[in-house]
Regions:
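A domain-level signal for the structural core that forms small-molecule/cofactor-binding pockets
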Residues: 10
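Short glycine-enriched, charge-decorated loop/helix-capping segments at active-site entrances
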Residues: 25
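Domain-length cofactor-binding catalytic modules of enzymes
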Residues: 3-7, 15-18, 32-52, 60-338
């Protein structure tokens, strides 16, 4: 799109993000010290739509200008209380084994297997409030002849509202990154581990990019940047691998790739088809211990990530594979934030 942004095409969970941290602990400790890993996940983040930390966490993002819009100003205290929390829906924090087949100089890692922490979450309640407010503004300004495109209503970046949304969206990007930073630092501290390398990337965002000689606003909802040489993480499900990838810069896809496996069925269908207890028992047989989760997030609700990766081999190259071993998600029935 040229010169305009579509708030709803960015999405409710603005700047939802993946972050992978490689730790200095051997993979064998995932079994040998399971209780320590469990306590680190349970103490290091909170799940649920209204989840907060008992004591607000410190991060430089809270010193940024939150007065860029009325919504961000009014929601700053809520955002601070939710800093370092994970929310609901398909958001997770998990430990697993990262398999790197060959030396990667950018990661600074030799070939081998590593213990790693992977998280998926975004800008929490404040991001949702920004989306709701500016999507409503965009719809109210939509010419009548386009009324059938209500959820694709746009804001011109030459307008005050468009500039406000753009500033708020970028603040939410910084806030989402800070969320993951707080989670990973706290979890690794509770674990007594050192972070030796990492990869992160976000989706549900809009970027100003040059394509075909024109500046465009590229919206990636459910997609992630995959520019030439750009590192990222593409997850599967709680029982299937995630992949560290390096973008190939495919112009036809606007330098983009899928941000995950994607669902094969709705949450309602998953709850009707699967019982959580049976799924949990099956996962344990496969070596995956799930601390908390809901039936709507079972592996069967998702597409085959291996097939998805084969289908986008022209978009990204696989660098490493992450296999989940200890998983935590929301299990309190909260409305999905993703």
């Amino acid at each position: 799109m040229e010169g305009a942004v579509i708030p709803y095409a960015v999405g409710v969970d603005i700047a939802c993000r993946m972050k992978l941290s490689i730790l200095d602990l051997p993979p064998a400790t995932l079994d040998d010290k399971f209780n320590l890993y469990k306590e680190a996940l349970e103490g290091g983040t909170r799940f649920g739509i209204g989840s907060v930390h008992e004591t607000p966490k410190d991060h430089p993002v809270m010193d940024q200008d939150w007065n860029v819009t009325r919504i961000t100003r009014e929601k700053k205290d809520v955002a601070w209380s939710q800093l370092g929390t994970s929310g609901s829906g398909n958001h997770f924090a998990e430990f697993g084994v990262l398999s790197l087949p060959e030396l990667d100089s950018e990661l600074g890692l030799e070939a081998g297997q590593y213990t790693a922490l992977l998280s998926h979450s975004g800008s929490r309640g404040t991001g949702a409030a920004v989306c709701s407010s500016y999507s409503a503004m965009a719809r109210s300004r939509l010419p009548r002849k386009y009324e059938n495109l209500a959820y694709l209503a746009w804001l011109s970046l030459d307008s005050q509202e468009g500039q406000e949304y753009w500033s708020a969206m970028n603040l939410m990007g910084d806030y989402a990154a800070a969320n993951h930073d707080v989670i990973h630092k706290l979890v690794s501290k509770l674990l007594g581990a050192k972070i030796i390398a990492g990869v992160e990337n976000h989706h549900n965002f809009a970027w100003k990019e040059i394509h075909g000689g024109r500046e465009l606003i590229v919206h990636r909802k459910g997609a992630t940047p995959a520019g030439a040489g750009q590192l990222g993480v593409i997850p599967g499900s709680m029982a299937s691998p995630a992949f560290v990838v390096r973008g190939k810069g495919n112009a036809e896809s606007l330098n983009s790739a899928s941000h995950g496996a994607g669902r094969r069925m709705s949450r309602k269908q998953a709850k009707e088809k699967y019982t959580w207890k049976a799924v949990q028992q099956d996962l344990e047989k496969k070596g995956v211990k799930v601390l908390f989760a809901g039936a709507d997030e079972v592996p069967g609700a998702y597409k085959d990530i291996e097939e998805v990766m084969r289908e986008q081999a022209d978009l990204v190259a696989v660098v490493a594979r992450f296999d989940p071993r200890i998983v935590k998600m929301c299990s309190d029935g909260s409305q999905a934030e993703d």
